[in-house]
């Protein structure tokens, strides 16, 4: 079993990169997050691995808090109208492509403001496809992403 550590906190982006510890099967682990594309440097609070596209491998969602905590709601939403700002602090979705994780957050429909504190992966609507629920804090509404069964989600 491998271990993935979501490293939030008030540190610089370099110091809060998430950690992927790969089991070497001799009571040791090696850190390989960068190699696998999972060295997310946002303020991560939780992570889940699941097969969102039913291709037989595990994909990944890293739930993040916003870098813009403490701003009033109007300023916060103005800041997040800039896609670069938004992409740094949104929760991130990674597709497993041949053992390397690729950030496809915008492609799957999850590029939205996030202050995630709770994450649930389940078939919410009983259609056999896994959906995503993110419980956000402060003035960011919770998000219920229902699978469109085509590799994208709709926030309902």
Residue ranges of model-derived segments:
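Acidic, glycine/proline-rich Ca2+-coordinating loop motifs
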Residues: 1-156
